[in-house]
């Protein structure tokens, strides 16, 4: 019985010494068991290395074990375990059930139990307890030593959960974490390790469970050899936590304590002092880094480096692209093998997709060394979404998550048809499950013939029944089921009914045929995982009563804990992984990417359920558990040291200065430390682009990425930028390559691409727009915004997918409709706005809205609680609006005379006729919300009011550009009709926008009712253009003094109008605007009929017509594309507008 340490710094040859020692023992033909004990993740590599040292005949005499493998061997030898092992998934499901049953008994974790990830946290702490040999009884016995209430209650909760977990678990199962505890007991009966010599390698520390196993082995074996990565032995002395080797020296001290307690001999240690070390025999620089990285003081290396390099990049993508180029260069120019290269990072999740994308493009074979979660696998999504459909009452999201898994007998076209219908009509809940066919006809924005619509509706119902039949059967079969076992049985029958096992097998075969080995391996494991999860539910809680929602949660918890481990599909490939999973053997070249602050070294982890103070307190009371975050942070130094000393030939560290969102990233402290040691370190960056053939050669690697660089350089050449001659040779290579010639020709044609098509044939445009042209004024304004958007919307009639929701335009139309009906009700009853009873008016608004809802004219407002709230808001807004309109009318002499005045063939007035220069007549149609009239001095003055649900400003500049024409053309049309049809002398009074709203008043507590009303009136002040006549202004606001709070006017003390603070125009200016609007509309209509469909959106200081345009994916407007330019509209001052208008009219 003895212990021997084999120690040395990284790369000194400790592992090789163990292998050579084993070989020597075999050659000496010593009759004793020879064991190599390594961590589980290194067992495969250790076996491989041992076989390389030993020949095939002698290799069988040695066993390579991990602690887990050792446990299984002993259990097979002496027996003692009859129960099955429960995996992490089963543990989580069992813990979920325990916490649900005890949630009312928990003191601290009652609320936390509902949070996502809590089950995993509890599972982790129980694992920690077991590894530190802590039982529920030990926790309970120590409670009296805990004075602090919060910690005491925490430990009580943990003891309760832990105790019930142990009780329920051991009915049918055993926890994986119990293996080593049982191993300690069974080793007394085992003969396998009697007089054995054991070599223990690649460990930096052990858990208390593992120390207990080692103690037993030390008492049974001939000798245990343990490798320690350290520069010297501590021999039981105090350990400085800041020492990079402190974790190793702590391990040494604990081992020394064990042999001292058991009177076991300590053999003379083997010191592997080397200069240079075996690993770094070909690199003085890497040897220097190993010696000085954590040495104080350190020794500077002043020569230029070639084996250690740094790279600063613009972002993560260019960082990985540069890494790929460097790998290709090393393999191409220096004969390196992909299998000798590793790329690691402290943020694998953030880099994984980028590495996959770039390495595939550069044809670099790679394997990402990580376990894959299964939550996003379509099979798991199918199972969970099927149960979610039933537990969440058939919501759109859950139903289509289920349907879109690709595992049901419904194709994509059928799915799209069904989805469009469901979205358009808000199908949910019982509408899916009742036998009655769907009869809604509004499933598109297009008007279809009755027969076509009937056929499409029949098809939709056929798709619905086919798609929903399996899940409706599942729903029926789950009725009246209460126990977990019954739920599992019904779910299994459902999966078989949709032929899932056969479909999975077909998918595996397809993946293999397409060379997607990793995908095939993943799907090969999924069905077994599903069955294992169901089995563990049945075994652990099968007889317990649960609800469907609980069953869904338990399954979700179980699947979330599963991770699939994949075997590398080939040997010669780059290993990509995280720093914590780095396999240290046989890596010649190492790329560490993302060497940024907060990534490498890793930041302090969150403290978890037990804080650092809690752990310190418990440790002081003799209840030792895992290290606190500060201790782990000190151990991170050793991880950094181990990582930097892994490669034997070449190390490159790279760091981006910004992440994918453009946020600044700082380089890690490691970068500055290494720069101090290596004062002339090889340092590159891609931020400052250098010119020259050598730099261009760096971009020439694999065919695909080089082709992208060729595109960039050809574009520069076309734009007149001088490019390097080498790109001519590159172009020639692709041109002469059969595979690339077609792509190259498409590329060349692409340089002449433009998305513009300025005009189309007049005949075609006539077919699209109709003849004679009959359009609304708002459509004319739309054409002014962008001719192409107009063409797509009104020519091609392209529309958004119809969704069952309430848009702002829908709401606006609804409110207009209610106001119109209310106005006509006033007329019918002979009630004036300024004398109406407000209580009656509010009741009338309620009545009109309720009638609309009863008639289902706006069915959506009855569809949910949210829309009930919207309905209440609409009622409040309309009640506020009718009060406001009444206040406005009380303040003036204008009287409402027309509501929803229409211009159309069957309207109040005929369409507004516009004769083009060709003699053709264009008919404009439209509707005015309200027209108020004033009879004064033999003339009739018009006040035209447009109700708006949003804020709308009146800008002369927009009138000039054809963006704001409606009110002016309506004014012109009414004045013309009054004069020509009725001989009435009409005059412009005002053009106004009235916002329909119920604004929030601030500081309402300190205000009287009158002050509140005044604030609301001021808040909802109308915008527009007023006749510059003080008398007419008085007829609109008879209490005006200074700035009016209802119209955009300010009067001076002498009664005159302050033109600088008012939006006013004289009669002559109104006349000019009438002429200009007609001129502009004629000009726009002629452009329209000539076939102008140019992609030319306007752009102003406050935005562009592209901002809310739904057709951007159609036009693909981009100022980088030839011929794509904004129609820049400069906001003009009013005086500039008047000048410009006069000039145009004079032409």
Swiss-Prot record:
<dbReference type="GO" id="GO:0000724">
    <property type="term" value="P:double-strand break repair via homologous recombination"/>
</dbReference>
<keyword id="KW-0540">Nuclease</keyword>
<comment type="function">
    <text>The heterodimer acts as both an ATP-dependent DNA helicase and an ATP-dependent, dual-direction single-stranded exonuclease. Recognizes the chi site generating a DNA molecule suitable for the initiation of homologous recombination. The AddB subunit has 5' -&gt; 3' nuclease activity but not helicase activity.</text>
</comment>
<keyword id="KW-0227">DNA damage</keyword>
<keyword id="KW-0479">Metal-binding</keyword>
<keyword id="KW-0004">4Fe-4S</keyword>
<feature type="binding site">
    <location>
        <position position="1106"/>
    </location>
    <ligand>
        <name>[4Fe-4S] cluster</name>
    </ligand>
</feature>
<dbReference type="GO" id="GO:0004386">
    <property type="term" value="F:helicase activity"/>
</dbReference>
<keyword id="KW-0347">Helicase</keyword>
<feature type="binding site">
    <location>
        <begin position="8"/>
        <end position="15"/>
    </location>
    <ligand>
        <name>ATP</name>
    </ligand>
</feature>
<dbReference type="GO" id="GO:0005524">
    <property type="term" value="F:ATP binding"/>
</dbReference>
<dbReference type="GO" id="GO:0003690">
    <property type="term" value="F:double-stranded DNA binding"/>
</dbReference>
<dbReference type="InterPro" id="IPR027417">
    <property type="entry name" value="P-loop_NTPase"/>
</dbReference>
<feature type="binding site">
    <location>
        <position position="1115"/>
    </location>
    <ligand>
        <name>[4Fe-4S] cluster</name>
    </ligand>
</feature>
<keyword id="KW-0378">Hydrolase</keyword>
<dbReference type="GO" id="GO:0008409">
    <property type="term" value="F:5'-3' exonuclease activity"/>
</dbReference>
<keyword id="KW-0411">Iron-sulfur</keyword>
<dbReference type="Pfam" id="PF12705">
    <property type="entry name" value="PDDEXK_1"/>
</dbReference>
<protein>
    <recommendedName>
        <fullName>ATP-dependent helicase/deoxyribonuclease subunit B</fullName>
        <ecNumber>3.1.-.-</ecNumber>
    </recommendedName>
</protein>
<dbReference type="Pfam" id="PF21445">
    <property type="entry name" value="ADDB_N"/>
</dbReference>
<keyword id="KW-0269">Exonuclease</keyword>
<feature type="binding site">
    <location>
        <position position="786"/>
    </location>
    <ligand>
        <name>[4Fe-4S] cluster</name>
    </ligand>
</feature>
<feature type="binding site">
    <location>
        <position position="1109"/>
    </location>
    <ligand>
        <name>[4Fe-4S] cluster</name>
    </ligand>
</feature>
<keyword id="KW-0408">Iron</keyword>
<dbReference type="InterPro" id="IPR014140">
    <property type="entry name" value="DNA_helicase_suAddB"/>
</dbReference>
<keyword id="KW-0238">DNA-binding</keyword>
<dbReference type="InterPro" id="IPR049035">
    <property type="entry name" value="ADDB_N"/>
</dbReference>
<keyword id="KW-0067">ATP-binding</keyword>
<dbReference type="GO" id="GO:0046872">
    <property type="term" value="F:metal ion binding"/>
</dbReference>
<dbReference type="GO" id="GO:0051539">
    <property type="term" value="F:4 iron, 4 sulfur cluster binding"/>
</dbReference>
<keyword id="KW-0547">Nucleotide-binding</keyword>
<keyword id="KW-0234">DNA repair</keyword>
<comment type="subunit">
    <text>Heterodimer of AddA and AddB.</text>
</comment>
<comment type="similarity">
    <text>Belongs to the helicase family. AddB/RexB type 1 subfamily.</text>
</comment>
<dbReference type="InterPro" id="IPR011604">
    <property type="entry name" value="PDDEXK-like_dom_sf"/>
</dbReference>
<dbReference type="InterPro" id="IPR038726">
    <property type="entry name" value="PDDEXK_AddAB-type"/>
</dbReference>
């Amino acid at each position: 019985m003895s212990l021997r340490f084999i120690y040395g710094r990284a790369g000194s040859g400790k592992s090789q010494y163990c292998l050579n020692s084993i070989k020597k023992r075999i050659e000496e033909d010593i009759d004793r068991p020879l064991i190599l004990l390594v961590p589980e993740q290194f067992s495969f590599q250790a076996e491989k290395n041992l076989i390389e040292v030993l020949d095939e005949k002698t290799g069988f005499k040695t066993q390579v074990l991990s602690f887990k493998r050792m446990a299984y061997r002993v259990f097979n030898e002496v027996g003692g375990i009859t129960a099955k092992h429960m995996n992490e998934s089963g543990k989580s499901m069992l813990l979920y059930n325990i916490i649900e049953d005890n949630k009312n008994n928990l003191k601290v974790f009652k609320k936390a139990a509902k949070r996502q990830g809590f089950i995993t946290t509890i599972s982790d702490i129980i694992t920690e307890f077991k590894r530190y040999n802590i039982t529920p009884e030990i926790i309970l016995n120590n409670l009296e030593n805990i004075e602090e209430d919060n910690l005491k209650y925490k430990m009580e909760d943990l003891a309760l959960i832990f105790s019930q977990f142990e009780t329920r678990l051991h009915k049918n199962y055993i926890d994986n974490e119990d293996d080593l505890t049982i191993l300690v007991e069974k080793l007394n009966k085992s003969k396998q390790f009697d007089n054995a010599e054991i070599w223990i390698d690649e460990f930096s520390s052990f858990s208390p469970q593992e120390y207990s196993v080692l103690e037993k082995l030390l008492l049974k074996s001939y000798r245990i050899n343990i490798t320690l990565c350290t520069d010297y032995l501590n021999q039981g002395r105090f350990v400085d936590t800041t020492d990079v080797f402190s974790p190793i020296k702590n391990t040494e001290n604990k081992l020394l304590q064990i042999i001292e307690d058991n009177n076991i001999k300590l053999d003379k240690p083997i010191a592997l002092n080397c200069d240079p070390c075996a690993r770094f025999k070909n690199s003085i620089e890497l040897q220097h880094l190993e010696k000085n990285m954590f040495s104080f003081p350190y020794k500077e290396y002043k020569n230029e480096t070639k084996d250690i390099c740094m790279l600063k990049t613009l972002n993560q993508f260019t960082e990985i692209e540069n890494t790929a180029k460097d790998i290709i260069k090393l393999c191409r120019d220096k004969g390196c093998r992909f299998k000798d290269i590793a790329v690691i990072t402290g943020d694998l999740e953030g880099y994984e997709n980028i590495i996959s994308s770039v390495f595939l493009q550069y044809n670099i074979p790679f394997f990402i060394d990580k376990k894959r979660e299964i939550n996003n696998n379509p099979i798991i999504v199918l199972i969970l979404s099927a149960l979610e459909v039933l537990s969440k009452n058939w919501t759109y999201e859950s139903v289509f998550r289920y349907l879109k898994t690709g595992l049901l007998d419904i194709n994509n076209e059928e799915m799209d048809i069904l989805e469009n219908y469901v979205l358009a009509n808000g199908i949910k809940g019982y509408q899916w499950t009742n036998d009655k066919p769907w009869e809604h006809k509004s499933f598109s924005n297009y008007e279809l013939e009755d027969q076509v619509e009937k056929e499409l509706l029949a098809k939709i119902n056929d798709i619905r029944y086919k798609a929903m039949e399996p899940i409706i059967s599942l729903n029926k079969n789950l009725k009246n089921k209460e126990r977990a076992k019954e739920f599992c049985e019904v779910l299994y029958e459902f999966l078989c009914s949709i032929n899932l096992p056969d479909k999975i097998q077909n998918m595996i075969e397809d993946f293999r045929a397409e060379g997607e080995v990793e995908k095939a391996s993943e799907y090969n494991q999924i069905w077994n995982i599903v069955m294992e999860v169901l089995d563990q539910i049945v075994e652990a809680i099968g007889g317990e009563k649960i609800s469907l929602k609980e069953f869904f949660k338990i399954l979700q918890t179980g699947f979330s804990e599963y991770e699939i481990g994949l075997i590398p599909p080939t040997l010669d490939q780059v290993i990509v992984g995280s720093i914590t999973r780095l396999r240290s053997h046989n890596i010649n070249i190492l790329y560490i990417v993302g060497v940024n602050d907060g990534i490498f070294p890793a930041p302090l982890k969150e403290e978890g359920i037990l804080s650092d103070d809690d752990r310190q307190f418990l440790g002081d009371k003799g209840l030792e558990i895992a290290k606190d975050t500060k201790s782990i942070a000190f151990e991170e130094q050793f991880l950094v040291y181990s990582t930097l000393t892994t490669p034997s030939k070449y190390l490159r560290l790279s760091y981006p200065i910004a992440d994918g969102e453009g946020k600044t990233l700082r380089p890690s402290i490691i970068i500055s430390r290494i720069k101090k040691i290596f004062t002339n370190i090889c340092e590159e960056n891609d931020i400052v682009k250098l010119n020259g053939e050598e730099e261009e050669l760096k971009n020439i690697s694999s065919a695909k990425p080089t082709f992208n660089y060729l595109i960039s350089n050809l574009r520069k050449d076309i734009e007149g930028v001088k490019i390097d001659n080498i790109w001519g040779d590159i172009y020639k290579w692709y041109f002469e390559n059969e595979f690339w010639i077609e792509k190259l020709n498409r590329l060349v044609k692409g340089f002449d691409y433009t998305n513009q098509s300025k005009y189309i044939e007049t005949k075609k445009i006539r077919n699209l727009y109709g003849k004679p042209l009959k359009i609304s004024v708002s459509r004319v304004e739309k054409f002014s915004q962008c001719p192409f958007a107009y063409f797509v919307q009104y020519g091609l009639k392209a529309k958004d997918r119809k969704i069952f929701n309430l848009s702002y335009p829908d709401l606006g139309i609804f409110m207009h409709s209610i106001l119109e009906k209310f106005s006509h009700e006033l007329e019918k009853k002979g009630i004036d706005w300024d004398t109406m009873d407000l209580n009656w008016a509010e009741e009338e608004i309620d009545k009109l809205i309720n009638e609309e809802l009863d008639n289902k004219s706006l069915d959506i407002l009855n569809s949910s609680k949210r829309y009930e709230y919207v309905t209440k808001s609409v009622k409040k807004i309309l009640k506020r609006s009718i009060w406001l309109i009444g206040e406005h009318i009380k303040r003036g002499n204008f009287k409402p005379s027309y509501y929803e005045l229409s211009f159309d063939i069957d309207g109040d007035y005929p369409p507004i006729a516009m004769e083009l220069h060709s003699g053709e007549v264009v008919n404009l149609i439209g509707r005015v919300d309200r027209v108020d009239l004033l009879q004064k001095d033999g003339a009739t003055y018009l006040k035209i009011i447009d109700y708006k649900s949003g804020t709308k400003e009146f800008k002369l500049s927009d009138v000039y550009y054809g963006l704001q024409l409606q009110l002016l053309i309506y004014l012109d049309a009414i004045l013309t009709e009054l004069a020509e049809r009725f001989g009435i002398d009409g005059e412009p009074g005002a053009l106004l926008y009235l916002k329909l709203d119920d604004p929030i008043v601030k500081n309402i507590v300190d205000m009287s009712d009158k002050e509140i009303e005044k604030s609301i009136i001021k808040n909802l002040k109308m915008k527009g253009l007023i006749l510059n006549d003080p008398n007419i202004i008085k007829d609109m606001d008879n209490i005006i003094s200074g700035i009016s709070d209802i119209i955009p006017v300010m009067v001076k003390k002498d009664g005159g109008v302050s033109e600088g603070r008012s939006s006013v125009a004289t009669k002559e200016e109104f006349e000019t605007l009438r002429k200009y609007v007609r001129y502009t509309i004629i000009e726009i209509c002629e452009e329209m009929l000539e076939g102008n469909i140019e992609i030319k959106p306007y752009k102003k200081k406050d935005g562009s017509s592209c901002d809310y345009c739904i057709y951007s994916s159609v036009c693909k407007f981009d100022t980088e594309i030839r011929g794509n330019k904004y129609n820049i509209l400069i906001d003009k001052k009013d005086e500039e507008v008047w000048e410009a208008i006069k000039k145009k009219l004079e032409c």
